[in-house]
Design a protein with these regions (language model features):
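Histidine/cysteine-enriched polar flanking segments
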Residues: 1-204
Length: 204
């Protein structure tokens, strides 16, 4: 479904969070997403909107859909966001971040609690009085780079948090596990390998 070789950089090729923006009520998909993705959405009667801009292999056109939305905020780096995403989030406060690969690097856990692997993002959120757990990106595997990001290795469904790999193998794993249990999350490790940044785990 997510064979997207040749569209964007090899390290993020096939990553859902590069091609798809998702919030509680919307799914916005890059128009040049793999055909099989559109077939899957249509066959399963999953509502979505097509974005206006294609994903490409430069920074500016590979981060357009990689933003994070909560009921109150839209987090991204200003000037990089797909216009269709801005349109449906006009009522929210835009929070300027230093990292354009926002969804890769930031997870909204619940209410005012966040998880990030980016010190710049952590600084912005803490300055706003939000709770932010910093998770070292080292040991998160990704193709063609030294390390990936925590957002690309995580998915949340209800009170369950899924890890692409085993979070307990990471140097910060035990601390994060305790933090998540304090927030009443059920932790599900999808393998016994080190965490792998595959572009976020989305539930549609």
């Amino acid at each position: 479904m997510f064979q997207s070789d040749g569209i964007t950089d090899n390290s993020i090729s096939g990553h859902p969070d590069i091609f798809i923006y998702q919030d509680k009520n919307h799914l916005i998909v890059s128009p040049n997403s793999p055909v099989d993705l559109f077939k899957f959405l249509d066959i399963n009667n999953i509502a979505y909107l097509k974005g206006k801009k294609d994903v490409g292999n430069k920074l500016a056109n590979s981060v357009q859909y990689n933003c994070l939305s909560t009921p109150q905020f839209l987090f991204h780096k200003s000037g990089y966001t797909e216009s269709a995403i801005l349109d449906i989030n006009k009522h929210k406060e835009f929070v300027q971040l230093p990292q354009a690969y926002t969804r890769c690097s930031l997870v909204h856990l619940c209410e005012e609690s966040y998880l990030t692997s980016d010190r710049g993002i952590e600084k912005v959120l803490l300055k706003r009085g939000l709770s932010c757990f910093y998770f070292n990106p080292e040991e998160i595997i990704i193709r063609d780079h030294d390390n990936g990001f925590i957002g690309g290795a995580v998915g949340i469904f209800g009170n369950k948090i899924f890890f692409n790999g085993n979070v307990e193998l990471h140097v910060d794993g035990q601390r994060l596990k305790e933090h998540l249990l304090n927030l009443n999350f059920e932790i599900i490790n999808l393998s016994d390998e080190h965490l792998y940044d595959g572009g976020c785990i989305l539930f549609v």
